[in-house]
Amino acid sequence: MKIGNALQGAGVGLALMLAATTAGQSADLGAKDEPIKLAMLEWTGAHVSTHIAGQLLEKLGYKVEYVTAGNFPQFSGLADGSLSASVEIWLNNVGDIYPKVLAAKQIEDIGKLDLKTQEGWIYPKFMEKVCPGLPDWNALNKPGCVQALATPETAPNGRFLDYPSDWGSRAATILADNNMPYTAVPSGSEGALVAELEAAEAAKTPLIMMFWGPHYALAENDVGWVTMPPCKQQTNDHCITPPDVDKIVWSGFGAKWPAAYTFLKTFKMDATEQQKLMLAVDKQGKDLDAVVKEWIDKNEAVWKPWVDGAKG
């Protein structure tokens, strides 16, 4: 009887330990039945980063929703919790809302994505004959160059192809700061930007435009980067420098989804890898989810430490 009681007691103790362990694991996941809402921004690189993060969060046991959001408007959603996280925030282009909600501690910056970036003004390389002196920005001010870039829409100014208006851009401000005779004309979308670059390359049509890397188009088109004019003020509104890219979450994220929070803090994106996936989606027409799943299947050595670390 004593032995039986001892075994029974041990069994109860083991059951309690297992229950406590299971409860601890559930607590680490937090509100796993409530979806984590990831911001889906306008550019393909962000789609890639976001879907890799999302599929890995699902491996951790979370439900994930992808919510379309504008680059500036997303910060209102992150501040009020209607968006949970955004994993590819280019800090040189965050607008006026971001610093306010960050200072108010409505959002939290959880670190670098480690994405090696480029941003600035590009041109097809044949433009160096149209505007002698490129890549020096002063070459753009020469009358012959301005005339070559002028269109009926912008004459007598040259046309500068800018980001879509809802992305936000500093190009118009920098042009004005330096009294450059150009009118910034917003593009309709990322696809329209790339299409115009490719058309200019094919037809040798003069073009100067705002662009960024990593991007698959940079691997397929011969472009130069303008050596930028001086900054009137050392701020994001008046300067273009290779930007840092951070990950941002709603301020309540860590308390609500602890393991997801740990995972996103360690999540990284390699620019070369991202560019390969963008090429597959944008040029080869492959499905985004399928491309991301294939990458995850082939790169367990990359992401497994992030997931294992989040499990604790």
Region annotations inferred by a language model:
Residues 30-45, 62-67, 157-160, 264:
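Short, well-ordered beta-strand elements
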Residues 32-36, 45, 166-183, 187-204, ...:
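An extracytoplasmic/periplasmic, membrane-proximal ligand-sensing/linker region
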Residues 83-88, 159-232:
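Ligand-binding pocket segment of bilobal, Venus flytrap-like solute-binding proteins
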Residues 106-160:
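A conserved helix-loop-strand patch within extracytoplasmic ligand-binding domains
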Residues 118-130, 242-256, 280:
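A bilobed periplasmic-binding-protein/Venus flytrap-type ligand-binding module shared by bacterial periplasmic
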Residues 23-37, 57-58, 149-157, 302-312:
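Immediate post-signal peptide segment of exported/extracytoplasmic ligand-binding proteins
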Residues 43-44, 62-77, 185-196:
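Short helix-initiation/N-cap motifs at beta->coil->alpha
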Residues 50, 69-105, 196, 216-221:
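Pocket-flanking alpha-helical
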